[in-house]
């Protein structure tokens, strides 16, 4: 597991507060099982996977603007 730094994650979000919101939402998506990791999760917990995805530029603040309906549609498609 590579170390995830806040500074590297901040290249993809505006500030630390937004980073917390984005990481929390993504970690919740991963832990619910409705979404699959975009990177190899290995034995990492959802929070670490979320931060690694942000650091890699795969997830950004646009995740915060998703509506409930969009989430429901994605969940239905993945099942």
UniProtKB/Swiss-Prot annotation:
Keyword Ubl conjugation listed: no
Pfam families named in the record: RNA_pol_Rpb6
Keywords per UniProt: DNA-directed RNA polymerase, Nucleotidyltransferase, Transcription, Transferase
HAMAP family: RNApol_bact_RpoZ
InterPro entries assigned: DNA-dir_RNA_pol_omega, Pol_omega/Rpo6/RPB6, RPB6/omega-like_sf
Gene Ontology CC annotations of this record: DNA-directed RNA polymerase complex
Sequence similarity: Belongs to the RNA polymerase subunit omega family.
UniProt superkingdom: Bacteria
Gene: rpoZ
Protein's job: Promotes RNA polymerase assembly. Latches the N- and C-terminal regions of the beta' subunit thereby facilitating its interaction with the beta and alpha subunits.
GO terms, molecular function: DNA binding; DNA-directed RNA polymerase activity
EC id: 2.7.7.6
Keyword check for Transferase: yes
Subunit text: The RNAP catalytic core consists of 2 alpha, 1 beta, 1 beta' and 1 omega subunit. When a sigma factor is associated with the core the holoenzyme is formed, which can initiate transcription.
GO terms under biological process: DNA-templated transcription
Reactions mediated catalytically: RNA(n) + a ribonucleoside 5'-triphosphate = RNA(n+1) + diphosphate
Cross-referenced SMART domains: RNA_pol_Rpb6 (SM01409)
SUPFAM superfamilies noted in UniProt: RPB6/omega subunit-like
Name listed for the protein in its UniProt record: DNA-directed RNA polymerase subunit omega
Transmembrane segments: none
